[in-house]
Regions:
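Membrane-interface helix-loop junctions in multi-pass transport and translocation proteins
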Residues: 149-152, 163-195
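N-terminal membrane topogenesis motif
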Residues: 1-24, 80, 84, 151
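Short membrane-interface helical motifs at transmembrane helix boundaries
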Residues: 99-119, 178
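Interfacial/gating helices of multi-pass transporter permease domains
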Residues: 32-53, 120-123, 185-190
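Alpha-helical transmembrane segments of multi-pass membrane proteins
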Residues: 110, 117-141
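Membrane-interface junctions at transmembrane-helix termini in multi-pass inner-membrane proteins
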Residues: 135-157
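Interfacial transmembrane-helix starts/ends
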Residues: 8, 45, 78-95
Length: 195
């Protein structure tokens, strides 16, 4: 397969996975609003700037570095160096994510009250922190496979991640309703860690 065909194929795979993921996400948001109500979904949306900030601190640049270095080492036949790069990135990213998880769990009441302006966000922030280590591993592995031009792996994992998130929240809600309790928006936050 030529380089141009490989790029086109990779782009198509990523695009298709992105479209499917967005479609699932579209119906997921409808499910959330019907299940938890507008106010709870508003609280859920309120924590996402904090999620984006901490995720950027733990993963964003590391994924790009792993991808670039893997591509460079793979191009010259140094696959062992590419694996070492992945391992180093995983260690750094996981360490940062665990530190951020602990920090966020310890300071969630303060962040909820003083930065988000709503104390009800504290348990959501606390639960959301569990997603960081999983996100670090996922991000590093995706960077590695993208660097190897194996776009099918990150595409499939993106789709699988969304399905795991939706399934986890749906099953938690179903179980809670069968026990005659009201589902809590914390389930949606735990879905972040599951996906």
């Amino acid at each position: 397969m030529s380089k141009t065909q490989s790029i086109i194929r990779g782009t198509l795979i990523l695009t298709l996975a992105g479209i499917l993921t967005r479609l699932i996400g579209f119906y997921y948001r409808i499910f959330l609003s019907h299940t938890f109500g507008e106010e709870a979904v508003g609280l859920y949306q309120l924590i996402f700037p904090v999620y984006a900030l901490f995720f950027s601190l733990t993963c964003a640049g590391i994924q790009t570095a792993i991808s670039r270095l893997t591509a460079r080492y793979t191009a010259v036949g140094k696959s062992l160096q590419a694996v070492r790069c992945l391992m180093t990135g995983l260690i750094v990213s996981c360490t940062l994510s665990i530190l951020c998880m602990i920090f966020l769990q310890q300071t969630s009441p303060v962040i909820a009250l003083h930065f988000l302006g709503d104390q009800r966000c504290a348990p959501l922030l606390y639960s959301m922190a569990y997603a960081f280590p999983f996100g670090a591993v996922h991000s590093s592995l995706c960077g590695y496979y993208l660097g190897q031009r194996r776009t099918n792996v990150p595409s499939f994992s993106q789709l699988l991640e969304q399905l795991a998130r939706v399934s986890t929240v749906f099953l938690l809600c179903l179980f809670t309703l069968r026990q005659h309790f009201t589902p809590n928006i914390v389930f949606a936050v735990l879905g972040l860690a599951a996906g």
